[in-house]
UniProtKB/Swiss-Prot annotation:
GO BP, sorted A to Z: mitotic cell cycle; regulation of transcription by RNA polymerase II
Protein name as catalogued: Mediator of RNA polymerase II transcription subunit 22
Record's keyword annotation contains Nucleus: yes
Subcellular location: Nucleus
GO CC annotations, alphabetized: chromatin; mediator complex; nucleolus; nucleus
Known partners and oligomeric status: Component of the Mediator complex, which includes at least CDK8, MED4, MED6, MED11, MED14, MED17, MED18, MED20, MED21, MED22, MED27, MED28, MED30 and MED31.
Family membership noted in the UniProt record: Belongs to the Mediator complex subunit 22 family.
Chief place of localization: nucleus
Keywords: Activator, Nucleus, Transcription, Transcription regulation
Length: 143
């Protein structure tokens, strides 16, 4: 059921992309469910066939391995789907990205203005202290 050769090229329209994601989700979950059900059927089956018991056990074990591998493949496909959804949300959520950029730039502007005010205050204090020192130096009798 799970198609092994999925393309990573995304459809252009948002609706088609969401339908594609939904179809992938349904296919992978269906594949996992069907394979799991078949493994359970194999595990409890009492064989009354003409094949020897050893041969039947080997055949059942091989089929279980194949179905387990199909379940793993479907699980990996689901993990890839989750990664694709995360990437889609990160890359196409412009409103949140713009809001975060605006908030950060406003924060940086506020920080810059606070630093500018502190520097101006420090400059003014240093100018006053320098003026006082120069006045003291030039009016001193010890020059």
């Amino acid at each position: 059921m799970a198609s092994g050769s999925r393309t990573t090229i995304l459809p252009q329209s948002k609706e088609a992309l969401l339908k594609s994601y939904n179809a992938r989700l349904k296919d992978d979950v269906r594949s996992m469910l069907e394979n799991f059900e078949e493994i359970l059927k194999l595990a409890r089956r009492e064989s009354h066939s003409q094949i020897s018991k050893t041969t039947q056990c080997e055949q059942d074990a091989l089929e279980m391995q194949v179905r387990a591998a199909n379940m793993v493949r479907a699980g990996e496909s689901l993990m890839k789907l989750v990664a694709d959804l995360k990437q889609y949300l990160i890359l196409n959520d412009f409103h949140s990205v713009n809001e975060a950029i605006t908030n950060n730039s406003q924060l940086f502007r506020n920080t810059q203005s606070e630093c500018d005010k502190k520097l101006m205050k420090l400059r003014d204090e240093m100018a006053m202290d320098l003026y006082d020192l120069e006045e003291e130096y030039y009016t001193s009798i010890f020059k």
